[in-house]
Every structure is written in structure tokens, then in C-alpha cells.
Amino acid sequence: MNEFNIAAQDFLQRVFNKLDAQNIQLDKHWFIDHLCYRVSSLENYNSFKTRFASFAELLIESDVNGRPIATYKFAEPIRFRDWFIQVVELPAPKPGKVTIEGFEHFEVVADIGFDEIKTRYPKAAFSESGLKKDFNPELEISLGELAIKFHPLSLESVIRLEKNEAVYAAVKGSGVLKSLKEHQPLLVGTFPLGINVSGSDVDVLINVPDLTAAETLFKKHFSGFENFKTEAHAQYSAVTASFDFQGVPFEVFAQVKDSAKQSGNLHFLAEERLLHVGGASLGEKILALRKAGDKTEPAFAKALGLSGNPYDELLRLQKLSESELRQLLR
């Protein structure tokens, strides 16, 4: 692990040197959720799997377009500046492609959308091919042989969804993300966090030009699904659509507001990082409170001993760096 940690530190320093040279600053409360380590052959892929098994937990190994990709979580995080990175993705090389062995990129979950990222870094060399994906699209900043990528869901949250086969199949099969793609759909809520209970629904946030358009949009795409209904929420300036697909309940929440800036997403981002910092013990506490009837944000507030309005407290925590969150959870 020590040799791997040294290599990771060197990689991260090289990336940040390139970012600094382009005046690209990452906010300290953004989540560097994983690193990607590429290998040059299938033989080396299997060799690294054996090495990783001695100091990391295998979260999942999947076949992606004909090649295996393994994801590991380290018991001890790789610390760099204010970030503590625990997850590493290990893809086997694509057949016929020459791959340089070593760390290649890291991925970031930010609290701003792709358009704002492009506006913030106007001189960056963006690759937008990953934006075509309906599920967890990504925007890349190319840095020569290295890169960073932005995506709305951390890799660990994606893996939690993939392991919940019925829910993952419903998300894919319903086409909800594809049909709402031009409205910045964000998948949030308890399923990606692994704290879902009986009755939990799949939560999706979208941005619409006006609320009347939202109702029209919902009827167009979802009126044929079971238990479809829409509801206006004046207190939130929002409209929701709820429906069932393959026995899985969905709720789509629409506001005239950038999806990334909506409170539902900011709460989700805070909770995702708190579970990253607090680990399995915090997750178990939250799940027990949820099963006892607490809603998600009050459950976090109770587990963390937060005073005041739980929703406001989580918005406050969302802006803290990981170092500050770790201090809070001591």
C-alpha cells in the first residue's frame, strides 16, 4: 500500500500542477471520489487485482463493453491536501489499444452543473463525449496524458445502485433519465446512498423553463406508467410527478432552477460525503433511524447531534471541506 500511496501522491501533484498552470481551482468541498489506474495488459490487470486484494476491499467487478473493470475501496484513504480518496477503479485495457500503465485521471462530484464548469474554466481543454451518456454523464478536462472528469454521482453511489438490481433495471428501463436529458436530470435520494427503506422512491431532480411546462413534460413521458400523478408544491415553487415502473416508485421534482443548485441535490451531496467520511458505522445509524420512521435529513441531524433545522444544517455542512467534516465527526 505504501508504494501505491506514493504513486498516487505523485500523480495527484502532477495533475494539480497542470491545473494550477491553467488557473483551474477545484473548490475544497468538491468530492474527489475516485482515482483511475490503467494497466497495459490483461495479465497485469490480474496481477494488480491480487495486489489490491491485500489492502483493499473489492466493491465490484463488472464486464463493460467486453472488458473487466474492478473497483476497490481502501481501508486507509489516500490523503492529498483537503481530500481523502478511498476508491480506485482498475480497468483492463481495451482490446487492441496501447495503454500507458499508471494513474490516468480522477473524478470529481461538484455542486455546479456542466455548463457552469465550462464557463468557470473557459481556457480548459474539454472533452464532451461523455455527456452523451444518459446515466451519470461526465465532462472531461484533458491535461495531456492525464485528465480530470466531473460527474454527478460518485462511483461508489453508482455501484450501490448497480447492486440493487431491481432499482437499477427500473432506472434504465423506464428511460426517465433519457427522456428528461435536456432538463439536467440528477438522480439523488436514498438508493444511491444505500439508506433506502421500504417505501423509498427513486428521486430525480430536473430544471424546467416554467412549472406549466413541467406538467406537460410529465404527462408526455410518464402518464402511461402505473399510479401516475402530478402535484404542485407552492411552498417549494415546484411540481412533482410520481409513478411506478416495474414495481419501483419514482418521484421527479421540477423547479425553475439549475438542478445542481436545488436543495435536494445539495442535501444529497452533503449526505454522500458524510457517509464517505463516517463509513459503515454512520450508515448503519442512519439506516436504523430511517427504519424507525425518520426522514433522511432529520436522521442525519440526529445521528450527528446537530442542533437547529436539519435541512439548513446539511446545507451548511455541504460547504465544508473533507478535513472539516472529519473534524466534525471525531
Where in this protein do the model-derived segments appear?
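Glycine-rich, aromatic-bearing surface loops/beta-hairpins
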Residues: I117-E162, I286-A299, G305-R330
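N-terminal interaction modules that seed assembly of large macromolecular complexes
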Residues: Q22-E57, G194-V202, N207-V208
